[in-house]
Amino acid sequence: MNDIAHNLAQVRDKISAAATRCGRSPEEITLLAVSKTKPASAIAEAIDAGQRQFGENYVQEGVDKIRHFQELGVTGLEWHFIGPLQSNKSRLVAEHFDWCHTIDRLRIATRLNDQRPAELPPLNVLIQINISDENSKSGIQLAELDELAAAVAELPRLRLRGLMAIPAPESEYVRQFEVARQMAVAFAGLKTRYPHIDTLSLGMSDDMEAAIAAGSTMVRIGTAIFGARDYSKK
């Protein structure tokens, strides 16, 4: 077993243990392998170990990887864009990715809707919440959620699937859980209006257990799978 396969197995075991501790089924939680700055060869190792969902933060880098595996004839992969999205890059996301986690304004959602090719299924989207109210983070306030969700839900080439957040780092589990619960409550409220939504993208390596206990359905794990990132190669 190579390092990436070993790391994936360890992460899956942690997800399973965290789910079991709070009475949830591990199958309720999707592992999104964050492969930003990592070479296609590392992703190939993860694919060989059974991983199919990958997250990318940089548009062109992600598109290059998507094309690489398409040219190799690899099927069944699911590509998630999880970085801040500029208007001038929206077409590439609309044309190549399966998911976009970072919807935080109607203008971007409308562009993605208009640019999604007719031959592809609707683009799965999550609305990003700035749950810790950090100036450095993208996302909307919870008070803005209802209005944006209603507008996004009307766009036919997008499929609203739920919410995403990147909470501020917290060292204490209790505080991690409190913040994650705020997101879970917002997600539950949204689900009463849009019963089809099913995805709360919340939790990374340091707060995964608290996020799962609060109700996360998708955790985003990078370094614990692929090792430290080299941002000089992005």
Curated annotation (Swiss-Prot):
PTM annotation (N6-(pyridoxal phosphate)lysine): residues: 36
Q: Matching InterPro entries, A to Z?
A: Ala_racemase_N, PLP-binding_barrel, PyrdxlP_homeostasis
Kindly list any coiled-coil regions of this protein.
none
Fetch the Pfam families from UniProt: Ala_racemase_N
Q: Which residues cross the membrane?
A: none
What would be an example GO MF term here? pyridoxal phosphate binding
Q: Which GO terms describe its cellular component?
A: cytoplasm; cytosol
Which keywords describe this protein according to UniProt? Pyridoxal phosphate
**Claim: S-adenosyl-L-methionine is one of the keywords in the record:** no
In its keyword annotation, does this UniProt entry include Ligase? no
Q: What result is annotated for mutating residue 36 to A?
A: Does not bind PLP
User: Per the record, what phenotype accompanies loss of this gene's function?
Assistant: During the stationary phase, the deletion mutant exhibits a completely different intracellular pool of amino acids and produces a significant amount of L-valine in the culture medium. The log-phase mutant displays slightly decreased coenzyme A levels, accumulates 2-ketobutyrate, 2-aminobutyrate, and, to a lesser extent, L-valine. Also exhibits an increase in the levels of isoleucine and valine metabolic enzymes. The mutant also accumulates gamma-L-glutamyl-L-2-aminobutyryl-glycine (ophthalmic acid).
User: In terms of domain of life, where is this protein from?
Assistant: Bacteria
Q: What family does the entry list?
A: Belongs to the pyridoxal phosphate-binding protein YggS/PROSC family.
Entry function:
Pyridoxal 5'-phosphate (PLP)-binding protein, which is involved in PLP homeostasis. May have a carrier function to deliver PLP to the target enzymes or a protective function so that PLP does not inactivate essential lysines in proteins. Does not have amino acid racemase activity.
Q: What's the subunit arrangement here? A: Monomer.
Q: What is this protein called?
A: Pyridoxal phosphate homeostasis protein
